[in-house]
Amino acid sequence: GSEMCIRDRWCIGAFTKAKDAIAVLTPVYGAFDTSASDAQRQIIAVPMNRDEDNRYTVDYEAFETAITKHDVKLFIHCNPHNPVGHVWTEDEMNQLFSICERHGVLIISDEIHQDLITGSTPFTSALTVASGAYADNIIAMSSLSKSFNMASLHQAEIIIPNEKLRGQYNAYKTHVYHTDLSLIHISEPTRRSYI
């Protein structure tokens, strides 16, 4: 699924260099750490705050400090968050993404669990936050593997609205192993309907 593309270093390899810093909000899905360290990138763990009701929130000041202190190049955002299940509100994402934009940090948004939500907060794709204001700085991913129990397909959708970033990604992926089934391309009109 989405993690396959990150773990296989497609996006990490296409958009960062060895020793670059990648930020994650912790606790976090272990493959994010592994994929970065396997690619000789450093993970910058920014701990989320947990209250007495086990709800998680972000310390935005700590997030921005970590980004500037470590010269972070990439932020891996997971919505709903894995493993805590937090569904990010548009306001929360707006705050995170504005910090990333201010410091030139690219965002990968893993949205693989978008259909598996409990609670009252609706899923909002990172691509639609602030009426799509951040879309040129976001790479969104999802997969059929969670919602439809199709993990054996090793399939993922990657949506890259920014043409320059899409070109960079397409150039990189020609140098990594893949099967034709894992690279189903979406036509331009269909892709536009997602954002």
Language model features: what each stretch is:
Residues 1, 6, 184-195:
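Single conserved hydrophobic/aromatic residue that forms the stacking wall/gate
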Residues 10-13, 24-41:
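Substrate-binding/gating loop at the entrance of the active-site cleft, primarily
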Residues 41, 102-105, 135-136:
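A short helix->loop->beta-strand "cap" motif at the edges of active sites that frequently abuts
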Residues 50-121:
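Active-site phosphate-binding strand-loop segment of PLP-dependent enzymes
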Residues 166-176, 180, 191-193:
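Structural signature of PLP-dependent enzymes
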